[in-house]
């Protein structure tokens, strides 16, 4: 990915993380660049009214395809291998994944149970890649990558109805 585009995505992600933190957290400590990049967390702090400290890795709305006009709110993109072939964010060190939503502001899902659930699904399918063309509807739990763009990442689309069966919190702000 070209550096200017990365910086733009990074800035947009940081603004979203600040939005989440300002509305929902107290005693915020921001991750260093290395912690964000390699440990996969944006900030640590406690949810308002809770004294326990957690690490959070904030995720924004996603389009199924970059060329799509609108963001979608049907499935969550879950990265288990990053663009350099290292561990993806679902294998990182955050405790909670706050995911921006359309139907309500945020869903927080515990990272480790999400990975355990996803890993079981991947093993059941023997890590089967999607056979669909980029413009066809996304296939839940099929493995996608962006090798065409020179990336070594692996990710799946997980329906929110399945995410909501895991331990989660819906936030109104």
Range-by-range predicted roles:
Residues 3, 7, 18-50:
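A short acidic/basic microdomain associated with nuclease active sites
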Residues 13-18, 111:
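A structural signal for well-ordered alpha-helical scaffolds and beta->alpha junctions
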Residues 5, 50, 102-173:
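Non-catalytic C-terminal interaction segments of nucleic acid-processing enzymes
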Residues 3-8, 29-31, 60-108:
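Catalytic cores of nucleic-acid endonucleases
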Residues 43-66:
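Conserved catalytic cores of phosphodiester-cleaving nucleases, focusing on short active-site segments
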Residues 13-14, 33-35, 168-173:
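Accessory terminal regions of nucleic-acid processing enzymes
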Residues 40, 53, 94:
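Extracellular structured ligand-interaction cores
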């Amino acid at each position: 990915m070209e550096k200017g585009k990365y910086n733009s995505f990074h800035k947009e992600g940081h603004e979203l993380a600040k939005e989440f933190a300002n509305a929902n957290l107290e005693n915020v400590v921001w991750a260093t660049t290395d912690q964000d990049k390699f440990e996969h967390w944006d900030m640590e702090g406690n949810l308002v009214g809770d004294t326990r400290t957690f690490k959070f890795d904030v995720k924004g709305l996603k389009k199924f395809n970059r060329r799509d006009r609108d963001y979608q709110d049907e499935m969550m993109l879950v990265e288990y291998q990053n663009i350099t072939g290292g561990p993806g964010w679902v294998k990182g060190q955050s405790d909670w994944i706050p995911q921006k939503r359309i139907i309500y502001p945020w869903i927080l899902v515990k990272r480790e149970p999400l990975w355990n659930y996803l890993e079981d699904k991947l093993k059941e399918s023997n890590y089967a890649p999607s056979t669909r063309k980029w413009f066809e509807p996304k296939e839940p739990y099929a493995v996608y990558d962006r090798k065409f763009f020179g990336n070594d990442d692996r990710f799946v689309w997980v329906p929110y109805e399945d995410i909501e069966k895991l331990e989660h919190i819906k936030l109104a702000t």
